[in-house]
Amino acid sequence: MEAAAVTVTRSATRRRRRQLQGLAAPEAGTQEEQEDQEPRPRRRRPGRSIKDEEEETVFREVVSFSPDPLPVRYYDKDTTKPISFYLSSLEELLAWKPRLEDGFNVALEPLACRQPPLSSQRPRTLLCHDMMGGYLDDRFIQGSVVQTPYAFYHWQCIDVFVYFSHHTVTIPPVGWTNTAHRHGVCVLGTFITEWNEGGRLCEAFLAGDERSYQAVADRLVQITQFFRFDGWLINIENSLSLAAVGNMPPFLRYLTTQLHRQVPGGLVLWYDSVVQSGQLKWQDELNQHNRVFFDSCDGFFTNYNWREEHLERMLGQAGERRADVYVGVDVFARGNVVGGRFDTDKSLELIRKHGFSVALFAPGWVYECLEKKDFFQNQDKFWGRLERYLPTHSICSLPFVTSFCLGMGARRVCYGQEEAVGPWYHLSAQEIQPLFGEHRLGGDGRGWVRTHCCLEDAWHGGSSLLVRGVIPPEVGNVAVRLFSLQAPVPPKIYLSMVYKLEGPTDVTVALELTTGDAGSCHIGGISVLNAETSSRHSLRPLRVPPTKLARWVGRCGRQLSGGWVQHCYEVSLRGCLLLDLLVCFSRPPGSREEESFTCRLGEIQVVDAASLLAPLPQVQAVTISHIRWQPSASEREGPPALLQLSCTLHWSFLLSQVRCFRIHCWGGMSDDSPGRELPRPEMPMFLGLAFATQYRIVDLLVEAAGPGQDRRMEFLVEPVPKEGFRVPQAEWGRAVLLYSAPA
């Protein structure tokens, strides 16, 4: 249901707000009516900045309980929440065309620049995510309420992420694409055919002329390009006729060529299944029977039942493309495999010995098969055992901002202020994760630092990074490297760190960085040049932050709510490459004892000073559509006093400048569902995060309009800049919904 829109000035809007707060409201008008624009004395809402001539769009709606059906492919049938989806047949694939609803599933995050690039010949690590059929809690694009969701956060060890399911065309849920891209990891969907039905599907597009298979390839490329992921794993798990298998290499070559043209860095991989005779016959290696498929695309993913002799034989077959062979490792250890489960390191030891890439299949084993309450401990144990075989990659662009949020939590916090209580899970909200693990000093090993993700407290989002350690008596400090970067830096950068120490301790905390190109690199704003290397620097906190940067540094040097402290730094550089971010923990002056510490990191930011002064565009053209009304669940009989409102917001904004959008409203009410809390009177109610220029509001509790009355809802869209500061409310986008009872 579309609401009729009219435009009014703020003065008319304020007059109507006063009417709705107790005065008699005028009769509801028709859709063509416009609100009068007679100026009135202005009364400011606390905390709001009002521009005199600013206009807002008002949508009029007469409440109706008639259904407004939404397409089930794009919306959960029970809640109408937007969901990620798959395609189940060749017909669905060929018929796919972009629709407005597809916009929910388009990735906001482009693939981040990284070093080394994926095209380098360093052996890579591929993670193939296969969990209980796929499209579980991760299908809810705007998040969901989940007590113990699965989380992956060792991204700096991963080069390629494949989302796997047994549906014909598996389009990765957008949350995975956003999160992986943020970490410089490319994302592949899966094109799979299986059993007799799969055989018929393959014959339909492969046994004919080139137009048939080119149409399928073109559609796969269009889907990749539209949803902004990076390519496909091709998995043919059925026998092929001679005609069909003969057309498979040209299909792969055409798909790979077209993808490379349309998607920078695009990737097509072939799974070890069918051989060149058309038989379904897994080889567990690259050999003369399947080499033709490897030669036709970007890489080869082997089956899992290999032995070291398979790896040795593959050396000759792979030649200079050794890194393009991804040796499959089933973490569930099904079949006659090497390693698996907590012995997966045995598989990787052999694979890396021979210089191949690795494909870890279903590492969600730690979540599916072990106790959920021990998930984080088991996840860290699993990846910790693989650490020596997993080379990391570096992020190489600014701004660099992270609150360590995992995209989940037991409550939601916004810059130290609690917004909502209750479990939540939103994959797109996961921010850049650090290098995890335990770091020990040399010698007797008494000095150590460990990092863990922790849901118990947060500065922004739902989690923080817990750093525990011991400073032994013989050293003055210990440091932990959190991020590997290779970022060219502008002449001046600002850095910020939010942290808090727990328990009685006098240990001091400092942010450090390392720089490259030391011969020509000049750096200002440092307090200590580490004696071990001229490229590691300890930063000097700003005592008086520049007033022109108040919106970013307003909290610098202050003790904040919840015990958090924020330090800000200004660093001048010339000809430098930013390599690492470290946090250093130093013993108090005069101390000669062993010092233990527990520190919680809430946020780290590295931003170009010039970007903080650049104006941010405003959110434009907010619209309201697909409105659905329901009586409150507790008032199914008689005239309802409360209603449940669902609707979709759309707006315009330059996506390259934002991390996400925060959606709020005036006029909504708290309900009993977890994660939603009645706001303070001077604050709008937070509804959720959007990682697209559209957002579906679902079952918002509102007051019913009485006879002859209008009720008012105001929806606000807050852009969150990549630099990580809050935008004043006057710069948010907004739209008003005026609704009335039927005549």
From Swiss-Prot:
Residues 1-55 are annotated as: Disordered. The modification N-acetylmethionine is found at residue 1. Residues 291-383 form the BRCT domain. The keyword Signal does not apply. The modification Phosphoserine is found at residue 66. Its EC number is 3.2.1.96. InterPro entries: BRCT_dom, ENGase, Glyco_hydro_85. Keywords: Acetylation, Cytoplasm, Glycosidase, Hydrolase, Phosphoprotein. Its main location: cytoplasm. Widely expressed. Expressed at higher level in thymus and spleen. Residues 1-11 have a biased composition (Low complexity). GO terms for biological process: N-glycan processing; protein folding. GO terms for cellular component: cytosol. This is Cytosolic endo-beta-N-acetylglucosaminidase. It comes from Homo sapiens (Human). The gene is ENGASE.
